[in-house]
């Protein structure tokens, strides 16, 4: 029973190390993007949610100021 626990624990740790190495490799590949189109897509992904969040905050205030029905 004890040896089974040790081997399962070893497999678990080896699996987590393998996952972390794969994630680091994936991150390194994402950093190596040199094409401007791919870089623009990444910029859009970062800024579109920010713009949408700001619009969601300010649109009700602007609508309230225009219609004066607050």
Swiss-Prot record:
Pfam families: Antimicrobial_1, FSAP_sig_propep. One of its GO terms (cellular component) is extracellular region. InterPro entries: Antimicrobial_frog_1, Frog_antimicrobial_propeptide. Keywords: Amphibian defense peptide, Antibiotic, Antimicrobial, Cleavage on pair of basic residues, Disulfide bond, Fungicide, Secreted, Signal. Residues 23-44 form a propeptide. The keyword Signal applies. Belongs to the frog skin active peptide (FSAP) family. Brevinin subfamily. It is found in: Secreted. Its main location: secreted. Disulfide bonds join 64-70. It comes from Lithobates palustris (Pickerel frog). Antimicrobial activity against the Gram-negative bacterium E.coli, the Gram-positive bacterium S.aureus and the yeast C.albicans. One of its GO terms (biological process) is defense response to bacterium. Residues 1-22 form the signal peptide. It comes from the Eukaryota. This is Brevinin-1PLb. The keyword Oxidoreductase does not apply. Expressed by the skin glands.
């Amino acid at each position: 029973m004890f040896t089974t626990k040790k081997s399962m624990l070893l497999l678990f740790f080896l699996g987590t190390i393998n996952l972390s190495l794969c994630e680091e490799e994936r991150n390194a590949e994402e950093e190596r993007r040199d094409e401007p189109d791919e870089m623009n897509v990444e910029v859009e992904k970062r800024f579109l949610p920010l713009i949408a969040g700001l619009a969601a905050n300010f649109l009700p205030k602007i609508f309230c100021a225009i219609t004066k029905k607050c």
